[in-house]
Amino acid sequence: MAIAIIAEYNPFHNGHIYQLEYTKKNFPNDKIYIILSGNFTQRGEISLADFKTKSKIALKYGADFIIKLPFEYATQAAHIFAKGAIKIVNQHKIDKIIFGSESNDVENLYKLANLWNQNQEAYNAFLKYALKLGYSFPKASAFALEEISGQKIVFPNDILGFEYIKQIVANNYPIRAYTLKRSEEFSLKNPEPNIASATYLRQLVNENKSISRFSPMKFIHPVCSLANLYPEFQKIVRETSPENLAKIWLISEGIENLFKKHINEPNFEKFLNAVNSRRYTNSRIKRAMVYILFRIEDPSQFDEEKIQLDCWKNQGF
């Protein structure tokens, strides 16, 4: 018997420690597997800590086994991220997963996943319609689900959890999902006494502020950041033709021309703001930037272990 947690640990923090302790307490007969992203994340960010460090700290705080989520899944949109992660869970004959959820209503997520599975033709028609209107894929997916179910999934952990359960239902995997209540107050503006979101902690780290109240991890500047690689990204985009940019994975729908148009923006944040639109979310843009920076045409053939950034030396626990 085993239970899986699908994680990025960017960075590992007290909320993750609580999840491991909760899982060990409530599933005492199960080995805990972490399906863990490597050095890059689903939102297109460079992980603050490398895979090896994240693995060590997870094992220290209660995980039994670490399985790496391949780059080709770890740096994709939520539905592809979930597809890869749940496929790995099934391959390793792990019969349970547990994830944080704002609603903590796993039965409703199953209900919606079954409704989606039984109405894929209608769902796909609504999805296609929304994409034609210029919606981003996440917004189009939410629109299509609401059209067939009358419900919106609005919280980020519920959205990702729904994607996990969709994969379980669609593939009839012998896996049962469980949830751990995660407060919607668990945010940038409302950190709890000793627990804060990874987003908030990344902000503190980037501002060179201590996160010791919220995490056992320590970081020294300069830390890993896509913003620090923006000059290199500018150089590549300026020197590469649109035709050759379009050969890179995720560079489609003319996004290469949009990048060319705004490549003289003076910094990463201004570039993001210039390129961001209803169709292209920040995460979609950042994922594309990662693929351009490392000239990745086929993510299944990309060995991220060959990328060694000095900033990964500036972290530990």
Swiss-Prot record:
Q: Which Gene3D superfamilies match?
A: HUPs (3.40.50.620)
Catalysis performed (reactions): cytidine(34) in elongator tRNA(Met) + acetate + ATP = N(4)-acetylcytidine(34) in elongator tRNA(Met) + AMP + diphosphate
List the keywords (alphabetical).
ATP-binding, Cytoplasm, Ligase, Nucleotide-binding, RNA-binding, tRNA processing, tRNA-binding
- The answer to keyword Nucleotide-binding applying to this record is yes
Q: Could you name the Gene Ontology cellular component terms for this entry? A: cytoplasm
**Keyword Isomerase part of the UniProt annotation:** no
Q: Which InterPro entries does UniProt cross-reference here? A: Rossmann-like_a/b/a_fold (IPR014729), tRNA(Met)_cyd_acetate_ligase (IPR008513)
Cellular location of this protein? Cytoplasm
What are the binding positions for ATP in this chain? 6-19, 100, 157, 182
Annotated Gene Ontology MF terms? ATP binding; ligase activity, forming carbon-nitrogen bonds; tRNA binding
Tell me, which GO biological process terms does this entry list?
tRNA modification
Record EC number: 6.3.4.-
The main enzyme category here is ligase
Q: What is its main location?
A: cytoplasm
Q: Which family does it belong to?
A: Belongs to the TmcAL family.
- Cite the PANTHER family for this sequence: TRNA(MET) CYTIDINE ACETATE LIGASE (PTHR37825:SF1)
Q: Which HAMAP family match?
A: TmcAL (MF_01539)
Q: What does this protein do?
A: Catalyzes the formation of N(4)-acetylcytidine (ac(4)C) at the wobble position of elongator tRNA(Met), using acetate and ATP as substrates. First activates an acetate ion to form acetyladenylate (Ac-AMP) and then transfers the acetyl group to tRNA to form ac(4)C34.
Q: What is this protein called?
A: tRNA(Met) cytidine acetate ligase
Q: What's the source species for this entry?
A: Mesomycoplasma hyopneumoniae (strain J / ATCC 25934 / NCTC 10110) (Mycoplasma hyopneumoniae)
Q: Which gene encodes it?
A: tmcAL
